[in-house]
């Protein structure tokens, strides 16, 4: 039984279509109402701005669902951009694609996208990408563990490659001897940040999130040795982030530019990244006073 009717969805789609100059067409404006009607949860609330934003995000999201010879992918930009990978994909925003797209009723779109990243020419390490965490949190909505379990070896391989690391324009991205992960801000989706290159709260939070996700996927697969191994990895990262990246004076997570150095003297929004993965213990919440 439907609780909400589709009249609001139709009204919003018609408004958005009128205001749009349609230059790129994967799922056309003409097809959008039928597509969203079949694929998204309907939503209604007293705040019209919030409601309009909800439907606008879905109206926009479908523009980026792209059919390719490797199945469906989700793009960040509609026009091709030179810093993208195969099929104009970019790993930097990909986890957000899963967190939003997990509510799509047709699982084919993100199933294809998952296999693309790990087996069909995607470049999941071109930018920071909490891929295992994104896959697992999608599973919590779909409850279909088949692609998750099938891709577990690939997720482990991806994590191992982050640990080994690689050289990028004179820098070594990956895990260092101190146990933390190093990256440059551009590869972390934070180019021109004040904190700059180093052991950043972002990437280290992402690796914590991925380690926890792999542990949970291994639990579904009944592979206790892998479950324990990755839970231990997550615990070590958590302790290091709290010990090395927390500024006890300004009460904030910051960038550590180099091993043995001092933390950067800047509070940036990415200092809240650890809470995205529910990582910090109690006692660190004073950082949130900056937003109160």
Language model: regions and residue ranges:
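Eukaryotic PEST-like, Ser/Thr/Pro-rich intrinsically disordered regions enriched for SP/TP/PP repeats
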Residues: 2-3, 52
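The feature captures the catalytic groove of carbohydrate-active enzymes
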Residues: 3-24, 115, 121-129, 163-232, ...
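Substrate-binding groove/exosite segments of carbohydrate-active enzymes
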Residues: 15-152, 156, 254, 259, ...
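Short amphipathic alpha-helical coiled-coil/interface segments
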Residues: 54, 58-61, 155, 227-245
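Proline-centered turn/helix-capping motifs that create local helix->coil transitions or kinks
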Residues: 65-70, 105, 164-180, 243-250, ...
């Amino acid at each position: 039984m439907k609780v909400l009717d589709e009249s609001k969805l139709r009204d919003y789609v018609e408004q958005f279509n009128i205001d749009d100059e349609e230059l790129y067409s994967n799922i056309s404006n003409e097809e959008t109402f039928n597509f969203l009607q079949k694929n998204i949860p309907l939503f209604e609330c007293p705040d019209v701005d919030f409601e309009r934003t909800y439907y606008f995000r879905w109206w926009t999201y479908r523009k980026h669902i792209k059919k390719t010879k490797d199945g469906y992918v989700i793009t960040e930009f509609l026009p091709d951009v030179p810093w993208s990978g195969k099929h104009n994909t970019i790993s930097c925003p990909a986890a957000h694609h899963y967190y939003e797209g997990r509510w799509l009723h047709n699982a084919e779109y993100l199933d294809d996208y998952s296999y693309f990243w790990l087996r069909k020419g995607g470049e999941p390490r071109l930018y920071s990408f909490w891929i295992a965490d994104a896959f697992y949190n999608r599973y919590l909505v779909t409850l279909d563990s088949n692609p998750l379990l099938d891709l577990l070896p690939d997720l482990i391989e991806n994590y191992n490659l982050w640990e080994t690391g690689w050289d990028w324009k004179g820098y070594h991205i990956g895990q260092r001897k101190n146990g933390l992960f190093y990256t440059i801000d551009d590869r972390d989706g934070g180019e021109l940040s004040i904190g700059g290159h180093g052991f950043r709260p972002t990437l280290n939070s992402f690796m914590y999130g991925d380690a926890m996700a792999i542990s949970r996927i291994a639990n579904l697969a009944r592979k206790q040795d892998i479950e324990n191994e990755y839970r231990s990895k997550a615990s070590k990262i958590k302790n290091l982030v709290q010990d090395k990246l927390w500024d006890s004076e300004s009460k904030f997570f910051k960038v550590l530019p180099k091993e043995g150095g001092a933390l950067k003297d800047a509070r940036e929004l990415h200092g809240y990244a650890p809470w995205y993965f529910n990582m910090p213990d109690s006692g660190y919440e004073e950082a949130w006073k900056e937003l109160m």
